[in-house]
Amino acid sequence: MNPSQILENLKKELSENEYENYLSNLKFNEKQSKADLLVFNAPNELMAKFIQTKYGKKIAHFYEVQSGNKAIINIQAQSAKQSNKSTKIDIAHIKAQSTILNPSFTFDSFVVGDSNKYAYGACKAITHKDKLGKLYNPIFVYGPTGLGKTHLLQAVGNASLEMGKKVIYATSENFINDFTSNLKNGSLDKFHEKYRNCDVLLIDDVQFLGKTDKIQEEFFFIFNEIKNNDGQIIMTSDNPPNMLKGITERLKSRFAHGIIADITPPQLDTKIAIIRKKCEFNDINLSNDIINYIATSLGDNIREIEGIIISLNAYATILGQEITLELAKSVMKDHIKEKKENITIDDILSLVCKEFNIKPSDVKSNKKTQNIVTARRIVIYLARALTALTMPQLANYFEMKDHTAISHNVKKITEMIENDGSLKAKIEELKNKILVKSQS
């Protein structure tokens, strides 16, 4: 059997949208294939990895059933040379697709924690059979940048595609440019047909629609038509509907007429889980020490964290060395300095003392009272996470003998956090207060 025929037969097993978005551009590589190895080329590395994970076993099974032979399936990114040979028709086909989703943004790859479980639950619930457009509609997810709003939005899109639904994903900028382009070309009917006839409309950063009244008017009518036809609408923003500047009251009212879910900065355990998930996806092996260092040294922007992980791997690969804690510190030093220069240990000490109703002089003393020791350890822990101070510098600040005393306190408070959920929550609360204050 011609292996290319496998994809055609597989097409019958999938929804039209799922096949078009993920497998239609997969090409059989006859030159690299052997009797027991079938190689397929995907448009890029990200798509290759996704198809290998999601469809590799299914393609192998399909091939064995229909040919009677077993084969290993290898999905790889096509080379630049092969890419240049792609026809203009293929490029036009890709551009014509109404949905451009990151295939790795799925519910399975989304790490759930206290900071995002409500938003996750609402989005996941509507992807169950017959729930789209009926259970929660619209869904409005808001929160600071880099916390997973786009991931969640596109997870709904990918799940909807697998259900055979027509999905439109667009940022506000995409929507505005699309409208402006069609207006200039006298093809607004095409614009209306695209957006009004979808099953699922996903709009990222909806706050930027507030640039002109005409854009908002168009979106208002599109919103109403999709909603009236039981289509699902999900939007993301940096603020809740009532705080959106430049957005008309009638749009704010419609945005709020459904589920409003916020995503807040993740707690430490969630950040660690996210880092592990990112490492797993990118096939990067980091020790627990490095993972904990990244989690406690960087802010809460997930894209930023993933960028550091990829940079670490690139450094190690190029230099031909192992990823060590020392390498991590070297790669991250400028980044951490930039983030931490506005936060001082005095700021941390002041806030912790206020929270525990303790004098700063007591925390800096040698007193061994339990509440003072705990407060001291929290200050040290937060100083390690939020400032660029080294252990010797912290030892000097607390007038301790040397940095080993600081290391001991860090170890003790880390153990306490792992065994005491309320303490962990309190420290996360203090950390967020310090970060907010430093940005004001």
Curated annotation (Swiss-Prot):
Q: Where is this region: Domain IV, binds dsDNA?
A: 317-440
Q: Which residues are involved in binding ATP?
A: 146, 148-150
Q: Which keywords, in A-to-Z order, does the entry hold?
A: ATP-binding, Cytoplasm, DNA replication, DNA-binding, Lipid-binding, Nucleotide-binding
Q: What processes does the entry annotate via GO biological process terms? A: DNA replication initiation; regulation of DNA replication
- Stored CDD domains: AAA, Bac_DnaA_C
Please provide, alphabetically and separated by semicolons, the GO molecular function terms listed in this UniProt record: ATP binding; ATP hydrolysis activity; DNA replication origin binding; lipid binding
Q: Region annotation Domain I, interacts with DnaA modulators: residue ranges?
A: 1-74
**Which GO CC annotations does the UniProt entry carry?**
cytoplasm; plasma membrane
Q: Annotated region Domain II: where?
A: 74-99
Cite the SMART domains for this sequence. Answer: AAA, Bac_DnaA_C
- What are the subcellular locations of this protein? Cytoplasm
ATP-binding keyword on record: yes
Oligomer status and interactors: Oligomerizes as a right-handed, spiral filament on DNA at oriC.
Its family remark reads: Belongs to the DnaA family.
Please give the record's comment on domains.
Domain I is involved in oligomerization and binding regulators, domain II is flexibile and of varying length in different bacteria, domain III forms the AAA+ region, while domain IV binds dsDNA.
Name the job this protein performs: Plays an essential role in the initiation and regulation of chromosomal replication. ATP-DnaA binds to the origin of replication (oriC) to initiate formation of the DNA replication initiation complex once per cell cycle. Binds the DnaA box (a 9 base pair repeat at the origin) and separates the double-stranded (ds)DNA. Forms a right-handed helical filament on oriC DNA; dsDNA binds to the exterior of the filament while single-stranded (ss)DNA is stabiized in the filament's interior.
Protein's recorded name: Chromosomal replication initiator protein DnaA
